[in-house]
Amino acid sequence: MTEQLIVRDEILIGANSQKVWEVLTKPKYIAEWDELPENYPNEDMTEGSKVIWELPNGGQSITKIIRAVVQKELKIALNVSNWEVKPNEGDVAYNYQLKEKGDSTLLKIEIGDFSLIKDGKMYYDASVEFASDSKQIIKKLSENLG
């Protein structure tokens, strides 16, 4: 059995889950903590929403929201068209869980499982950095929503 490559991180945010949810699902905020294509529509992301990036090698990187439980959980499947092995939808994903803690929200982030794909360690390492950086921006944006 291959060791799982799942990034796990969390942060306590001094804002309620409604504000954190807005930062996770509104493109104007997402663009500050993640990349969006230039022409992405300014509609809230919901279950079924997709973001498609054209890759320099001719492939596509596609993210699709496969679960959206408002103010509780957001699961975004990742698929890259030129991966040699195609995992099942959702087996490689970004998962954001929100838990109310009084006036604050605990945001738990899980990204992976990258052991299912070739060069998974490279994706894992990049995702460790992404989780660390993005959680700080999500915290700042959520706490400044007022």
Which residues does each PLM region occupy?
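Hydrophobic-ligand binding "helix-grip"
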Residues: G59-S104, G112
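Hydrophobic pocket/interface hotspot
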Residues: V20-L24, I30, V51, I65, ...
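Glycine-centered tight beta-turn/hairpin loop motif at sheet-sheet or coil-to-beta transitions
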Residues: Q4, P56-G58
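Short, hydrophobic/aromatic-rich segments at coil-to-beta transitions
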Residues: D44-I52, Q71-I76
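A conserved amphipathic terminal alpha-helix motif
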Residues: P87, G112-G146
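Generic structural detector for well-ordered beta-strands
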Residues: E10-L12, I52-E54, K64, Q97
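A structural signal for short, well-ordered beta-strand segments
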Residues: V7-I11, Y96, I109-I111
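Hydrophobic ligand-binding cavity/cleft-lining segments
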Residues: M1-P41
